Amino acid sequence: MHKKLYLASNSPRRWALLQNLGLALLPLASEIDETAHANEMAQDYCSRIAREKNQAAQAVRIRQNLAEYPILTADIMVSIDGEILGKPSHQQQAVEMLKKLSGRTHQVYTAVCVSANQQLFECIHSSEVTFKRLSEAEIYAYIATGEPMDKAGAYGIQALGGIFIQHLAGSFTGVMGLPIFETVALLKKVNIEVLPS
C-alpha cells in the first residue's frame, strides 16, 4: 500500500483537502482544451473535463518517465437554469453570475477521476446550493475582495462566499472542489487507504 498520489490540479482547495487526509501529493501538469461542446449538459461536461485532464496527466507522466503513482484529477461546474457558470473572466461577469444565483437554488457538479495501472475510476457528485437574496452592495463588496475571481460560479463556500449560503443539500467539500467521501472511495480502488478498514 502506498499513499503517494499525483494531483493534476492548480486548486489550492483540492491540495489542502487531500493533504488533510495525510496523502503525499506530487504535482503533475494536465493542460487541455476546456471548451464545452454544443448542447453539452453541465454534469457531462464536468465528467468529460475531469477524464480528459486525467488522460493528459497520464501522458505527461509517461513522457517524463515518472514513477507510476495513481493520478487524481477533478473538475467542478456550477449550473443554473441549464447554464454553466465557470470562473469569471472579469469583474462584470462575476457580478452577473452572483445576480443569477441571488435568492435561488443552483447545482454544483464535481467530477473526480483516479487512474492507476491503466485503469480509470470516476464519479460525479451533485449538490444543491441555495443563496440568500443578495443586495448590490453585498455583490460589489464581495467582488472587491477578489475571492470570486478564481472560482466556478464566482463564489467560495469555504470562505467569505459562505455567508451567502442559505441551504446546502449535498457535500460541503464537493462544493469546495473535491467531495471527500466519494474521493476516498475512489482512492481505495487503487489501494490508497486513508484509514485501515
UniProtKB/Swiss-Prot annotation:
Q: Show the GO MF annotations.
A: nucleoside triphosphate diphosphatase activity
- Its chief place of residence is cytoplasm
Provide this UniProt record's keywords sorted from A to Z.
Cytoplasm, Hydrolase, Nucleotide metabolism
| Gene Ontology CC entries for this record | cytoplasm
Catalytic residues (UniProt): D75
Keyword field contains Hydrolase: yes
Please state the Enzyme Commission number of this protein.
Answer: 3.6.1.9
Q: Which GO terms describe its biological process?
A: nucleotide metabolic process
Between which residues do disulfide bridges form?
Answer: none
**Does the record's keyword annotation contain Cytoplasm?**
yes
Q: Which domain of life is it from?
A: Bacteria
Q: Identify which cofactors the protein needs according to its UniProt entry.
A: a divalent metal cation
- Name the Pfam families on file: Maf (PF02545)
Catalysed reaction, written as an equation: a ribonucleoside 5'-triphosphate + H2O = a ribonucleoside 5'-phosphate + diphosphate + H(+); a 2'-deoxyribonucleoside 5'-triphosphate + H2O = a 2'-deoxyribonucleoside 5'-phosphate + diphosphate + H(+)
Q: Which residues cross the membrane?
A: none
Subcellular localization(s) per the UniProt record? Cytoplasm
InterPro entries, alphabetically?
A: ITPase-like_fam (IPR029001), Maf-like (IPR003697)
- HAMAP family linked: Maf
What the protein does comes down to: Nucleoside triphosphate pyrophosphatase. May have a dual role in cell division arrest and in preventing the incorporation of modified nucleotides into cellular nucleic acids.
Return the similarity comment.
Belongs to the Maf family.
Q: What is the designated name of this protein?
A: Nucleoside triphosphate pyrophosphatase
Species of the source: Haemophilus ducreyi (strain 35000HP / ATCC 700724)
